[in-house]
A protein has these predicted regions:
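Conserved ABC ATPase signature
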Residues: 152-157, 161, 422-426, 430
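Conserved ABC ATPase "signature" region
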Residues: 129-148, 399-417
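ABC ATPase "signature
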Residues: 235-239, 247, 504-508
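ABC ATPase NBD coupling module
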Residues: 64, 78-95, 121, 242-248, ...
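Conserved ABC transporter NBD signature motif
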Residues: 66-77, 340-349, 360
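A short, proline-enriched helix->beta-strand linker immediately N-terminal to the Walker B motif
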Residues: 172-176, 441-445
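A short, surface-exposed alpha-helical micro-motif characterized by mixed small hydrophobic
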Residues: 220-222, 489-491
Length: 529
């Protein structure tokens, strides 16, 4: 008989706010056998991540309260275990890959130090032996030139590369159970396939159980033995994968299986004036070596990109992780140094200093890929959204700022009554709406959207896309939309640029590029999507 590795029994979890407790997980029961993959799917805010984080008691208490039920690992309770017992389980026997990479990676340390720490603590390895293991694991998860990247800091990696490092960090301990919370979210389809194959191989080698949380149903089809569907904190359907996909019984499961980004970009305003003109943009990061960290070379990550973006238009930047998409966005924001010409609404930006840029900043806003990193956990939603107003409109009173926050929360589909809550109390999709509200409140002309829907399930993704389209039409916003999801790009973008290793592979109207791609790499991306 197969041994039950993990059993979640009638679990209910709540968040306390003053005198009230809001139940976010309600009477959930799941079990995972050794060598089995259970996929946990459901929309943002359904309780998937709270359920997963409860397994290792990683949620802060207070405000979290475990209202009823238990979680058992190999028959032993984890909810009622001592801190010492939990320390022996965390990382060693149960490893976790988090949804937001920067939660797991220390921004102050190079990758080698962080990965070595895992092997030193959990497997007692010495540095030389550990280095070989680290390089092998980084290579297996698809980090190019792994030996050269060991001295990089997390901020020098793309979002997808950070997720791959995080996966490597979890797998180095060779755990009995792996909890994977959206582990392939930021990865392009080709690397996603590599990661799934790697997880399958390691599962076979270690007889490892896996709780795989995702909104990507195509991954669930390829990887999961069984599937549990969550809605509003409850498990509404649970079955083996083949049966659930062939004949789902619950209406919500049927809705999930039928959801996919669709529709066309909003009509362009006529006439549409040029808002952003970029010529020969290039970004290079210095390579430093030696005790004195002297610059010995440069790593060119964006190579001579040129494009124009009109008011009310969306330009999609697509390509695999590490192709230079996010770096291009940071260069346009003047958050990193670059060469070339950036002209915004007739004003050259390249030679402006910080003081000269300030009057323009409110007109170019950004929504980052990772809302958990971009939202200050110590500020409540009101403080987060009004922060830009304090800088750019300092004469507004507190009451005026609050009224603007309430209005913009309505506009992005958030309940203004939640404005005194903190980011940790919101789901990933709700946090992304907060980030959009923070950008929108300054009435920008251009918003740079860096994978804004990549961490969201399909139903919430569709809601965010509808929101972005409606905001674009209402305010004549221009979007630079950075994504690896070609379905989303097709539904939102007028123009598209395909990047590979910092270079433009193909560029043109979205409809033409999707219908008749000229380059083999573009055809490969479309075939895998």
């Amino acid at each position: 008989m197969t041994q039950t590795l993990l059993a979640i029994e009638d679990l209910s979890v709540g968040f306390r706010h003053q005198q009230t407790v809001r139940t976010v997980v309600n009477d959930v029961s799941l079990q995972i056998e050794a060598g089995e993959t259970l996929a946990l799917v459901g929309e943002s805010g359904s309780g998937k991540s709270v359920t997963a984080l409860s397994i290792l008691r990683l949620l802060p208490s207070p405000p979290v309260e475990y209202l009823s039920g238990d979680i058992r690992f190999r028959g032993e309770s984890l909810l009622h275990a001592s801190d010492q017992t939990l320390r022996g389980v965390r990382g060693n026997k149960i490893a976790m890959i988090f949804q937001e990479p920067m939660v797991s990676l220390n921004p102050l340390h190079i990758l080698e130090k962080q990965l070595y720490e895992v092997l030193s603590l959990h497997r007692g390895m010495r540095r030389e032996a550990a280095r070989g293991e680290i390089l092998n694991c980084l290579d297996r998860v698809g980090i190019r030139q792994a030996a050269k990247r060991l001295t990089d800091y997390p901020h020098q990696l793309s979002g997808g590369e950070r997720q791959r490092v995080m996966i490597a960090m979890a797998l180095l301990t060779r755990p009995e159970l792996l909890i994977a919370d959206e582990p392939t979210t930021a990865l392009d389809v080709s690397v996603q396939a590599q990661i799934l194959q790697l997880l399958r191989e390691l599962q076979g080698e270690l007889n490892m159980g896996m709780l795989f949380i995702t909104h990507n149903l195509s991954i669930v089809r390829k990887l999961a033995h069984r599937v549990a569907v969550m809605q509003n904190g409850r498990c509404v359907e649970q079955n083996n994968a083949a049966t659930l996909f062939a004949s789902p019984t619950h209406p919500y499961t049927q809705k999930l299986l039928n959801s996919e980004p669709s529709g066309d970009p909003v009509p362009l305003p006529e006439p549409a004036s040029t808002l952003l003109d970029v010529e020969q943009l290039q970004v290079a990061f210095p390579i430093r070596k030696g005790i004195l960290k002297r610059i010995v070379d440069h790593n060119v990550v964006v190579k001579n990109i040129s494009f124009t973006l009109r008011a009310g238009e969306t330009l999609g930047l697509v390509g695999e992780s590490g192709s230079g998409k996010s770096t291009t966005g940071l260069a346009l924001l003047r958050l990193i140094n670059s060469q070339g010409s950036i002209i915004f609404d007739g004003q050259p930006l390249q030679n402006l200093n910080r003081r000269q840029l300030l009057p323009i900043r409110h007109r170019i806003q950004v929504v980052f890929q990772d809302p958990n990193s971009s939202l200050n956990p110590r500020l409540n939603v009101l403080q987060i959204i009004e922060e830009g107003l304090r800088v750019h409109q300092p004469t507004l009173s507190a009451a005026q700022r609050e009224q603007q926050v309430i209005a913009v929360m309505h506009e992005v589909g958030l309940d203004p009554e939640t404005r005194h809550r903190y980011p940790a109390e919101f789901s990933g999709g709700q946090r992304q709406r907060i980030a959009i509200a923070r950008a929108l409140i300054l009435k920008p002309s251009l918003i740079i959207l860096d994978e804004p829907t990549s961490s969201l399930d399909k139903t919430v993704q569709a809601q965010i896309l509808t929101l972005l389209k409606s905001l674009q039409q209402k305010h004549q916003l221009a979007y630079l939309f950075i994504s690896h999801d070609l379905h989303v790009v097709r539904a939102l973008c007028h123009q598209v640029i395909v990047l590979r290793q910092g270079e433009v592979v193909e560029q043109g109207p979205c409809a033409r590029v999707f219908a008749t791609p000229q380059q083999e790499y573009t055809r490969q991306l479309l075939a895998l999507s």
